[in-house]
Amino acid sequence: MATYLEFIQQNEERDGVRFSWNVWPSSRLEATRMVVPLACLLTPLRERPDLPPVQYEPVLCSRPTCKAVLNPLCQVDYRAKLWACNFCFQRNQFPPAYAGISEVNQPAELMPQFSTIEYIVQRGPQTPLIFLYVVDTCLEEEDLQALKESLQMSLSLLPADALVGLITFGRMIQVHELSCEGISKSYVFRGTKDLTAKQIQDMLGLSRPAVPIQQGRPLQAPEQPVISSRFLQPVHKIDMNLTDLLGELQRDPWPVTQGKRPLRSTGVALSIAVGLLEGTFPNTGARIMLFTGGPPTQGPGMVVGDELKTPIRSWHDIEKDNARFMKKATKHYETLANRTATNGHCIDIYACALDQTGLLEMKCCANLTGGHMVMGDSFNTSLFKQTFQRVFNKGLNGEFRMAFGANLEVKTSRELKIAGAIGPCVSLNVKGPCVSENELGIGGTSQWKICGLDPCTTLAIYFEVVNQHNAPIPQGGRGAVQFVTQYQHSSTQKRIRVTTIARNWADAQSQLQHIEAAFDQEAAAVLMARLGVYRAESEEGPDVLRWLDRQLIRLCQKFGQYNKDDPNSFRLSESFSLYPQFMFHLRRSPFLQVFNNSPDESSYYRHHFARQDLTQSLIMIQPILYAYSFHGPPEPVLLDSSSILPDRILLMDTFFQIVIYLGETIAQWQKAGYQDMPEYENFKHLLQAPLDDAQEILQTRFPMPRYVHTEHGGSQARFLLSKVNPSQTHNNLYAWGQESGAPILTDDVSLQVFMDHLKKLAVSSAA
């Protein structure tokens, strides 16, 4: 019998699913007493090189309110060619193509190893992928030049038949016609006035052909090219012309006087991009890629005025309700994001500037559409250049790692209902019998739209057990969930990926130890963290921390072993033991602590946390620390100030930064140049080892992390010191005659103090 850890691992590898509980409490009452909700992390397009897609349509349950897909959990009568749906128990005929099936000749979707299966379905004409570049020209010369080179480079990475378009903006917005005649023409719009989709389409001459397409199918083929030909062209036709056009782009010509910001019409430029795609290619895979080097300063969506003496809003301003443009700008971008999501398009934001660029207001454009958000200091850095290049990376099978216009539907057996989802998605408002009235995250629906996704995109999906306490589930009963993801593959094929999973029910009163042993503390920590970060968007920070603390105390009261009022007797079993420290680091993380971060930085961190898979999310919550020394091979060490020793090099991975920190002695040796002397070859290798390991992480991570190389006493050592558990501070340094580790100058509580308080509260009879 495999251990639960192995079971969890195998399921994640096969199905891309991690549940908080892997044996489910069998009644609503017992489930609420578990504190951590029944929920899962789902990576719909997890890479499975061993899973070739099948070239036929899935077989669906015939009950109109169910339509679940045939799967290995269904009961099959091979003689009568019937199958019973495991969700609604409807008996269904197999289609004629399945006439030859038998116990020894099963179709793939009935085999247990195909609990996840992918179908290629041909529905409607194939349309090429679309990339629309929206480029800010109010940049410094050096930055603009670097951005132009990156954009020119990207043309060679696009699929040859992809359509590409270009909009540039500064004080005015220019929509460029991309013809092959070599004459550059563009339509110019004022940046101060918002336009409706209809106005944009009329001005660009897009409305005429749109009517026949709606009514008569035969006209579609000849009319479609007319629409796109002027603004969106196949890259293989116009790559030379577009390369020249990008090369000739100039800085915004409007003079910027001393003490002023350039007038930047980002809000209207995005609005025109959304309107252009809405009128030409609704419900087709398309990316709007916004490159901006500063905040929007005029027109709808502006986040700050053009006077440099008035700084852009800070958290302090927002708390004091002193951010005068914020609400209006956020509303403008939310409207655009919802329109974009309705059309199945996604918006990427690449913001590179030393000051804030308005990501707080614009975040919904990427968050609701599944677009990327990249934040850097300048377009002329390897951080931006390599991250942008990775957008076009190819997977193990030589295909782009991007998919478009996905529709995720969740089906459950009758004892469960769906409470909601958290991730880069929007609700499709599909009500049904399996939708709960209690919402967690984006609820009230059993279907969500994810306009842009890749093999790492991960959603958190929350469930509610609705089975009544007095209606027991028969012994050995299993609950089931099916995830059906329909999407446009980067090869423009329509595909459907179906994952069907089942877990055992258990009576929490007589079989609590089974439920407890099957707790996945890593998944639970990430699922609770997502709920906390989701709440932090609309609630006060201290309230969210209090809520997380309360949940942690309740969990410890429920599953800890202790004598009343005796904190020293408190123990947590192995399947819960790491959970409190995840919560400790989450409380200190930039997702919940806005101190020392700008609103843009907080939005950026939260954006990535809401879409990464379990492994990356855990690194964000509790960074990984490796130590390199002469005492042995590199080893993971505690994220604690006691790990900072003079004769060690530390490598810390926080997901957003890779920090290499040289201990005091190592730094002195390096300054003395020992690594250059032949007799200290081993010291040279020691210095090189963390650099090689860091390089490996830098090669694969998206977005590329910031790389920090520092030493004891260096100004950038703060990146490490702010993350480690401050077990030794300036207050307790001399207690117990401690010698090891570095004291941290902080008033933050340490993990030890946190755990002591937690134990005290958990065992208290007053609680």
Curated annotation (Swiss-Prot):
InterPro entries: ADF-H/Gelsolin-like_dom_sf, Gelsolin-like_dom, Gelsolin-like_dom_sf, Sec23, Sec23/24_helical_dom, Sec23/24_helical_dom_sf, Sec23/24_trunk_dom, Sec23_24_beta_S. The keyword Cytoplasm applies. One of its GO terms (biological process) is intracellular protein transport. Zn(2+) binds at residues 61, 66, 85, 88. The keyword Transferase does not apply. Gene3D superfamilies: beta-sandwich domain of Sec23/24, Sec23/Sec24 helical domain, Severin, von Willebrand factor, type A domain, Zn-finger domain of Sec23/24. It is a peripheral membrane protein. Keywords: Cytoplasm, Cytoplasmic vesicle, Endoplasmic reticulum, ER-Golgi transport, Membrane, Metal-binding, Protein transport, Transport, Zinc. One of its GO terms (molecular function) is GTPase activator activity. It is found in: Cytoplasmic vesicle, COPII-coated vesicle membrane; Endoplasmic reticulum membrane; Cytoplasm, Cytosol. Gelsolin-like repeats lie at residues 634-720. GO terms for cellular component: COPII vesicle coat; cytosol; endoplasmic reticulum exit site; endoplasmic reticulum membrane; perinuclear region of cytoplasm. The Gelsolin-like repeat mediates interaction with proteins containing PPP motifs. Belongs to the SEC23/SEC24 family. SEC23 subfamily. COPII is composed of at least five proteins: the Sec23/24 complex, the Sec13/31 complex and Sar1. Component of the coat protein complex II (COPII) which promotes the formation of transport vesicles from the endoplasmic reticulum (ER). The coat has two main functions, the physical deformation of the endoplasmic reticulum membrane into vesicles and the selection of cargo molecules for their transport to the Golgi complex. This is Protein transport protein Sec23A. It comes from Gallus gallus (Chicken). The gene is SEC23A.
